[in-house]
Amino acid sequence: MSLILDITDETGRVPEDRLAEIEKLLQFAAAEEGVADGAEVSVTIVNNEEIQKINKEYRGKDYPTDVISFALEEDGEGEVEIIGADMPPVLGDIIISVDKAREQAEEYGHSLMRELGFLTVHGFLHLLGYDHMTEEEEKEMFTKQKEILNRYGLSRSS
């Protein structure tokens, strides 16, 4: 199983080896979750100013956040299946603030890579339909992301 990934660092502040690590982590998470071969995901690294604009425009919240996901494969009520639906899905976009990732890595006492990995997996699970609107959903999603990160080898001490 292999994702088609487009990873862009608009800030130019994330080293290439970390971007490559994000790609490996997403491939690992996709395999763990049984995602269809050829599914597409984009990851964009931005600064706080840019993610605040996106957060305000799409979520009505005028402050920077750490990660935002836009799932493209959500089935709405009454939607008709499109011809070619057997093609690999375009799962969506994950947008991560490198500024927030740095702040949170310092706050939690772990590496920037661990925080970027956490935010990447968190965003990816949202693309797969996981959420944390209820206590039950939160427990399921947070357990899943912890399992993926630990199996990959990116634990809190990383």
From Swiss-Prot:
Parts of the chain that traverse the membrane: none
Organism field: Bacillus licheniformis (strain ATCC 14580 / DSM 13 / JCM 2505 / CCUG 7422 / NBRC 12200 / NCIMB 9375 / NCTC 10341 / NRRL NRS-1264 / Gibson 46)
GO molecular function terms listed in the Swiss-Prot or TrEMBL record: metalloendopeptidase activity; RNA endonuclease activity; zinc ion binding
Gene Ontology BP term (one): rRNA processing
Enzyme Commission no: 3.1.-.-
Official protein name in the record: Endoribonuclease YbeY
Key words, A-Z: Cytoplasm, Endonuclease, Hydrolase, Metal-binding, Nuclease, Ribosome biogenesis, rRNA processing, Zinc
Binding site for Zn(2+): 122, 126, 132
Entries under Gene3D superfamilies matching the protein: Metalloproteases ('zincins'), catalytic domain
Family: Belongs to the endoribonuclease YbeY family.
InterPro entries: MetalPrtase_cat_dom_sf_prd (IPR023091), YbeY (IPR002036), YbeY_CS (IPR020549)
PANTHER family (UniProt xref): ENDORIBONUCLEASE YBEY, CHLOROPLASTIC (PTHR46986:SF1)
Pfam family of the protein (one): YbeY
Cofactor-binding details, from the entry: Binds 1 zinc ion.
GO cellular component: cytoplasm
The keyword Nuclease belongs to this UniProt entry's keyword annotation: yes
Subcellular location: Cytoplasm
HAMAP family: Endoribonucl_YbeY
Record bears the keyword Cell membrane: no
Organism lineage: Bacteria, Bacillati, Bacillota, Bacilli, Bacillales
EC class (word): hydrolase
Reported cofactor(s): Zn(2+)
Biological function: Single strand-specific metallo-endoribonuclease involved in late-stage 70S ribosome quality control and in maturation of the 3' terminus of the 16S rRNA.
